[in-house]
Each structure stands twice: as C-alpha cells, then as structure tokens.
Curated annotation (Swiss-Prot):
Catalytic residue positions: 235, 264, 296 (proton donor)
EC category: oxidoreductase
Name this protein carries in UniProt: D-lactate dehydrogenase
Top-level division of the source organism's lineage: Bacteria
Residues annotated for NAD(+) binding in this entry: 155-156, 175, 206-207, 212, 233-235, 259
Keywords attached to this entry: NAD, Oxidoreductase
Organism: Streptococcus pyogenes serotype M1
Length: 330
C-alpha cells in the first residue's frame, strides 16, 4: 500500500514517517499543496491525505477518479474547503478527523479570555515602558462572576463549557442539536439571541454552514449585552469582520479573541515578517487594540497534531481496505 501526503509540514512529516514505519506502509510526502499540477504526483498511489486550507480546485476530483484514487483524508475537522457534491459525483470519499483534541481548543479559549479580562497585553506593554502603576485600564474582572454563552455545544463547545463551569461561571448555550452531555453543564436557550442577551462572554464553537455565514453581524451585535466579549475559535466566516470592528469601536463590545479570519487563506500559516499585508480588513483586525488575534492556533498542541496526522492516515487505510470509514463526510 502506498499513500501520498500533501501540504505536510516538517513536524507532521516526523509523525507521518513514524506511523508509516509502525504500520509497514509506504508513504511519499510533499510540502506542496494539492493542485491540478501536483495531483499528478499521486499517480500509482492508493490513497491521499491532505491538509487543505483554501478551497480545493474542482478540476482535481475527476483527475483523481481517472487515477483510481477513491478518497481524500483531510487533516482537520472542517471540510468546507471541499466540494462534497463534486467529490461524490466522482466517487471520491472525503474524510475528516472530527475529534483530535477538543481540550486543546477549549483550554486556549479560556487562556485568551483570561488575558482579555485581566488586560495582560496592556500590563506587559506598560512593564516594558517601566510603567508599574495600577489604574482602571488594567483593573480586571473575576471570570467566575461572568455569564458565558456557548454557541455550538459539540465536542469543543462542551469541553469549553466544562472549564468555564469549573471557574464558577453561569453557562448557557445554543445549538440546533441539543445533547444530554451538554445539558449537564449548561442551560440551553431556544435561540442565539436568547443565549447572548445576558452574556458577559460569547464563545463560538459551531461548524460553518450556509445558514450561519456572517450570523454575527451588526444586527446581532446590537443584541449583545453592552461591553460583552466575543470569542471565535470556530470558523472566520461566522463573523462579519468589519461589523465586529465597528462594534468594538462603538463600545458595544469590550473585547474579542479571534483565532480564525474569513479570508486567512493567503496568510495562514505563513511568515509575513517584513512583508506588506494587502488585506486592509485583516490588518485592521490584527492591530485593533481590543482584539487578541491568533493565527488559527487554538488547536495547536502536541496531542492535536499527532491525532490529526494519524487520524487522516488511519481513515485512508480503512477506506482502501473496506471501501468506507466512520469519518467520511459524504
């Protein structure tokens, strides 16, 4: 059995090679993305694993079919970068890694919240200037006194809710699919609007859909409790970014922790040090004084990276051997 891996970073290569040695499977790695040009490198291979970031070119699906390759294993939970209908038309199974480390994202969410409510960024800036004074700009809030709204109560949302509950927060939530596990931790509300209206902190953990694209916009921000904090560790497209910046400037929101940006594809995960960022909206977001922006790094732990690599490769092997897998999404 031979597998081709695309978009492989150095640290992932080490893990993939160990997995291959442990399982007696031949693999070929490339840092290059999967494109109509590079897909030709998969000729003669049995399966593909890929860490796709932006939309996959539609021309790739029929090319894979011609090669006899029947799947693409994505190294993430989200698969919005794939045309699932076109994949199905070409007998290509797309798989994901649905649960690689919910705790990694949950812990990161709470880390950023604590930084925001205790003004850690400002304190560090002051200290570098040898300003050691106390005053209102750095006076913080107690997390346990806050009401938290979790929007999206799947694995990650639930893990996040549990941590906030452990701090003593009142936790409410909304999801179109309510779970018994979440009901033990939070109080479900019947709508997003009802969940957010009294929340000091709103934390987003839902998958991207056509229905929730730009759901968090100027109209919804007006329904927030004045001075609330917004956290987005989900997908960038659920927020209308300019409306978020306007809400921060107007004082409707007091802060935001943003790990994903709708148009991050050209920038993440790349080093742009010393280069010009031409996306003016992205520049405004990352430089806003009330925003802590992180480059889609909430998931990024040893455990998560290992689980993503191995999860994608295991799914590839399972499809080759059996024709299907439990992690298929089409």
């Amino acid at each position: 059995m031979k597998l081709k891996l695309y978009n492989v970073r150095g640290e992932e290569a080490v893990l993939a090679k160990k997995w291959a040695d442990d399982n007696g499977i031949e693999i070929s790695l490339t840092e290059s993305p999967l494109t109509p040009e590079t897909v030709k490198e998969a000729e003669g291979f049995d399966g593909i694993a890929n860490a796709q970031i932006g939309p996959l070119d539609d021309a790739i699906y029929p090319l894979l079919k011609e090669m006899g390759i029947k799947q693409i294993a994505q190294h993430s939970a989200s698969v919005d970068m794939y045309n699932l209908d076109l994949a199905t038309e070409n007998d290509i199974i797309i798989t994901n890694v649905p649960s690689y480390s919910p705790e990694s994202i949950a812990e990161f969410t709470v880390t950023i919240v604590l930084n925001l409510i205790r003004h850690v960024e400002l304190i560090r800036e002051n200290v570098k200037k040898q300003n050691f004074t106390w005053g209102l700009p750095i006076r913080g809030r107690v997390l346990g006194d806050m009401t938290v709204a979790i929007i999206g109560t799947g694995r990650i949302g639930l893990a996040t809710a549990k941590i906030f509950k452990g701090f003593g927060c009142k936790v409410v939530g909304y999801d179109i699919y309510q779970s018994d596990a979440a009901k033990a931790v939070l109080d479900y509300k019947e709508s997003v609007e009802e969940a957010i209206k009294d929340a000091d902190l709103v934390s987003l953990h839902m998958p991207p859909t056509a229905e929730n694209t730009h759901l968090f916009n100027s109209d919804l921000f007006k329904s927030f409790k004045k001075g609330a904090i917004l956290m987005n560790m989900a997908r960038g497209a659920v927020i209308e970014t300019q409306d978020l910046l306007d809400a921060l400037d107007a004082g409707l929101l007091s802060g935001a922790g943003i790990d994903t940006y709708e148009f991050e594809g050209p920038y993440i995960p790349k080093n742009f040090e010393g280069q010009e960022i031409t996306d003016s909206l992205f520049k405004a977001l990352i430089n806003h004084p009330k925003v802590i922006y992180t480059p889609h790094a909430a998931y990024y732990t040893d455990e998560a990276v290992k689980n993503l690599v191995e999860g994608a490769l295991n799914a590839t092997v399972e499809i080759i051997k059996t024709g299907t897998t439990t992690t298929r999404v089409n």
